[in-house]
Amino acid sequence: MAEKPAPEQEQEQTRAMEPAVLDDIIRRLVEFRNTRPGSGKQVHLSEGEIRQLCAVSKDIFLQQPILLELEAPIKICGDIHGQYSDLLRLFEYGGFPPDANYLFLGDYVDRGKQSLETICFLLAYKIKYPENFFLLRGNHECASINRIYGFYDECKRRFNVRLWKIFTDCFNCLPVAALIDRILCMHGGISPELMSLDQIRSISRPLDIPDSGLVCDLLWSDPSGDVKGWGANDRGVSYTFGADTVAEFLQKNDMDLICRAHQVVEDGYEFFAERQVVTVFSAPNYCGEFDNAGAMMSIDESLMCSFQILKPSEKK
């Protein structure tokens, strides 16, 4: 495994962003709270500022492991998909960092109207609070996917394709899983190739998401009540896994729970396999097409899990 960088080197890399510049970016992004919903207003960030967010956060991702080992208390959020106003609502509810520790499970971009604000806000917090704020990679943090589902077009419309490529380089360095005591977190799910967590630890970055195999499954697989063992996935990528597969995996690896995102669920969270898997989805009224709530899972010091719900808005 790569050695941890020497403290002075680490200092050098994380010092690459002036605290005053970072705080000003965060201030502008938070001020968006005061704008009228649906006003179409955007936060103004310069291309240089965004490039810096990508470069500095990328260094931090690479200094931290690909399988994060985190401690409770922590709040876990699922897909955001460019729904920036809802991301701000989540923080209003759970506390803006560093009042609470956070782990996000991926899918920051695509589909929603404000992928740029969403990802820039999250990267800014990652830089400001690197030991309290964590971001995993979702299947949409991948060039071949976000080229199609909106992020590329947003970057091109508001800036240029070059900036989209810089985000791609940053996304290729994101961690893919996190362990919080006996809770394993990832965007999608488990993999038929995953026997031991050391397999994840040994993956090197930067990394393109392959079309199949362990990393692909961690970001793409889904639980299914209709299958025993492993089944085909309607997405045309990866697999579905049954409750029996989950029980066997958890027992073998001495774990209690798999926490994942990746699927819209009506109440914002949903258990599967006798509460051995939980899906957390944090974009309410997803795409304006669903009536789902969004949720955030809080894990306290004693590893008790509770849920905070963002109700879908009444307006049609």
Curated annotation (Swiss-Prot):
The record's active-site residues are 140 (proton donor)
Molecular-function GO terms, alphabetical: metal ion binding; protein serine/threonine phosphatase activity
Q: How is the cofactor bound?
A: Binds 2 manganese ions per subunit.
Q: Which residues bind Mn(2+) 2?
A: 107, 139, 187, 262
Binding positions (Mn(2+) 1): 79, 81, 107
EC top class, as a word: hydrolase
Q: Which reaction does it catalyse?
A: O-phospho-L-seryl-[protein] + H2O = L-seryl-[protein] + phosphate; O-phospho-L-threonyl-[protein] + H2O = L-threonyl-[protein] + phosphate
A Pfam family (short name) is: Metallophos
Superkingdom, natural source:
Eukaryota
Q: Matching SMART domains, A to Z? A: PP2Ac
Annotated InterPro entries: Calcineurin-like_PHP_ApaH, Metallo-depent_PP-like, PP1_catalytic_subunit, Ser/Thr-sp_prot-phosphatase, STPPase_N
CDD domains given for it?
A: MPP_PP1_PPKL
Per the record, the similarity remark reads:
Belongs to the PPP phosphatase family. PP-1 subfamily.
**Chain segments annotated as transmembrane:** none
Q: What is its EC number?
A: 3.1.3.16
What keywords sit in the KW lines? Answer: Hydrolase, Manganese, Metal-binding, Protein phosphatase
Keyword Hydrolase set for record: yes
User: Gene that codes for this?
Assistant: PP1
**Per its record, how is this protein called by name?**
Serine/threonine-protein phosphatase PP1
Cofactor(s) this protein requires:
Mn(2+)
Gene3D superfamilies per record: 3.60.21.10
GO CC terms, sorted: cytoplasm; nucleus
